[in-house]
Amino acid sequence: MSIIYGHRGASAHAPENTLEAFALSMEMGADGFELDVHMSKDGELVVIHDETVDRTTDGTGFVRNLTLQQLKELDASASMEGFRNCRIPTLREVFTLVQDTDHIVNVEIKTDECDYPGIEEKCLALAKEMGVEDKVIYSSFNHHTLIKMRQLKPDVKLGMLFGDIMVKPWEYAKQLDVEYLHPMKMNIYVPDFAKDATAARYGINMWTINDKETISYCLEQNVGIITNYPDVAVALRAEKAK
């Protein structure tokens, strides 16, 4: 059965990567949600997609140049109608949401554009402290980060993110020692992609699947779905299960 993740939470319905979006994704029946982690100037793990705050808040500047206090003063509602005064959450705040649930958190570590020394260690230490290690899958476009995570914690769950249509990505994935492939959506239409990846013993979580046709196809292929519309994906999964 396909696992459904809210992409940056239920980001079609609430401001992306906010507690409001994550809580809504959970309410909609998603099995988990995906988020992005950067590090503030004072070393705090914060949840936001871009390297700057410009697009999703009323502020400007690089995340790495702002303290947590400065980040918390920003409105992260991105001018979405019906929302005001949403805040950039810390990863600690997000982990608190899932502590007593069965929800999965797909943490994308954003080291592909910025260097955040020690971010891998901090993510692992926080998950251990909060008792959510078994609920977390870590992914990154920086595959050196995945290698480092495996070295730090041999039993950590890892997903290899890639945006290209690769030839036999499961062969490359062996070098990284990951459990999951996290490909962009067009890979699902490569002949036998899901079949061959599954045969190679990899789980698949596809991004970002928003149209009903592709959601339905992913459900038929039994691959994980990362979507801005978890409500739509959950409804289609229930319909197909009848």
What do these predicted regions represent?
Residues 1-242:
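Phosphate-group recognition and catalysis centered on beta-loop-alpha active-site segments
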